[in-house]
Amino acid sequence: MDILIIVIATILGLLIGSFLNVVALRFNTGKSLNGRSECFSCGHVLSWKDLFPLFSFLLQRGRCRYCSSSISIDNIYAEVITAVFFGLIAARGIFFDVLLFNVEYLVATLFLFVIFSILIVIFLYDLKHKIIPDSLSLSFGILGFGSIFFFEFINKVFIYTGIHTPSWEQLLAGIFIPLPFALLWLISKGRWIGLGDPKLMVGIGFLLGIKLGVSSIFISFWIGASFALSIYIINFIFKKTLLQTGKKSIMKSELPFAPFLIIATLITLVFNLQVI
């Protein structure tokens, strides 16, 4: 049964990921989410069987069904990312010998699906535009704050416990975690760090608490530094410029930090990873 739950969650992630990609692409563009998707090359309205980029990419061998133009692999990132996120969220109990098929666990899992759906949209949007929309950070922050009244980490697993009074640590986590970075923004007048990242950390603090929240920040810096160093080494060895942004390589342009924060939040939550 545990394996079935993980498989269902992963498939659900593939399906929802397609929608989240549309949300990220159309966010702040004035386009309605109700409108049908179109081929970026020929403008042909896509049928229902073309609305899942991963399957379309594999079945059509990377080409549009109508004009045979190449389908950008960027379109499948959201599906793969969401599938991996949802699969890991559903599987988090396995790492601590917790039965997955129980009401409290499943309620928490569904709640985390909602939370990380918002975070994935932020992930994709920041990756493309290098900015975190305030409305998405606010939505995440509100849900994160609400979580401290209904969810807790029991035996290292995020689980539904029913309504309860949160501790002072839980209440202050949403302030404590982003505070140093907000001060850095204030002191540097935005030159060292943007304000979007501290806003995102408010929700992370409420969701994870102080200890796990601080751990997620450390892990995000490690992931970001490792990523940037890897790209630099590959560029140096092969004399190629990877991950270009216009005419600049990613090493010479602003590196979006929200994706690393979100990946670190997932890792910390799923594995209850404490580095301090």
Predicted regions and their residues:
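A membrane-topology feature that recognizes alpha-helical transmembrane segments
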Residues: M1-I276
